[in-house]
Amino acid sequence: MASTWFFLLALLAVSISNAFASDPSQLQDFCVADKMSQVLVNGFACKDPAAITVEDFFFSGLHMAGNTSNRQGSAVTGVNVAQISGLNTLGISLARVDYAPYGLNPPHIHPRATEILTILEGSLYVGFVTSNPENKLFTKVLNKGDVFVFPQGLIHFQFNYGTKDVIALAALSSQNPGVITIANAVFGSKPFISDDILAKAFQVEKKIVDRIQAQF
C-alpha cells in the first residue's frame, strides 16, 4: 500500500512540474496588452476587448535600416510586446538587425527565448557556446537566405566580416525575450562588480579590469 501511495505522489509531482515548466495555454483568442493597467502580472493585463482596434496588431518600420553608427557597428530594431500590444501572451516577437561593414552584434543571451535568424542581405559569421562544462563553440558563415538557430539562454553573436552592409531578420519565441549583453553586464553593471572579483574570475591584473570598466 505504501509503495502505491509513493508511486501516486511521484506521478503527481512529475505532472505538477510539467504543468509549470511551460507557458499556460491561451484561454481566449488574444490578450492585447493594457500598458496603462496598474495590475502587476507576469506580462501585461488584458485590454478591455471593447477598446481593441486593428492598430493593436500592427507595426510599421522594419523597412528602415537601424543606425549602425556606434562602437559595435550594429543596430537592432525590435518588434515585441512593447511595439505591438497584440503580441501579449502569444509567445513570439521579431527583430531586424543591421550590420555595418565589420559590425558586430556582441556576445549576448536571450534569457526567455530561442532565436531563429534569417539573412536577408549579405553574409554573417555567427556562433553560440554551449553551457558548462563543455563550453563548445558552434560557428557558421551564413549567406543570403540562410537560417540559423540560437538555443534559448546560450551565449551567441553575429559578425559582419565583409565590406558591405548586412541585414538579418530574427524571430524569437517570446513576446519579451530580453537581452543580456555579456560585456555590458559583467563590466558595465551599476554599480560596478568589484575589480577584485573580476580580476580573479578572468585571471588578469586589477588595472586591466579597471581599464575595461572605464569603457562602460
From Swiss-Prot:
- Could you tell me which CDD domains the record lists for this protein? cupin_OxOx (cd02241)
Annotated binding of Mn(2+), by residue: H108, H110, E115, H156
Q: Which InterPro entries match?
A: Cupin_1, Germin, Germin_Mn-BS, RmlC-like_jellyroll, RmlC_Cupin_sf
Task: Note the SS bond partners.
Answer: C31-C46
Q: Carbohydrate attachment sites?
A: N67
Localisation? Secreted, Extracellular space, Apoplast
Molecular function GO labels: manganese ion binding
Q: Which GO terms describe its cellular component?
A: apoplast
Record domain Cupin type-1: where: 60-210
Q: Where is the signal peptide?
A: 1-21
* Keywords assigned: Apoplast, Disulfide bond, Glycoprotein, Manganese, Metal-binding, Secreted, Signal
Which family does the similarity line name?
Belongs to the germin family.
Please describe the quaternary structure of this protein.
Oligomer (believed to be a pentamer but probably hexamer).
Its annotated function is as follows: May play a role in plant defense. Probably has no oxalate oxidase activity even if the active site is conserved.
Task: Note the PANTHER family from the entry.
Answer: GERMIN-LIKE PROTEIN SUBFAMILY 3 MEMBER 3 (PTHR31238)
Q: What is this protein called?
A: Putative germin-like protein 2-1
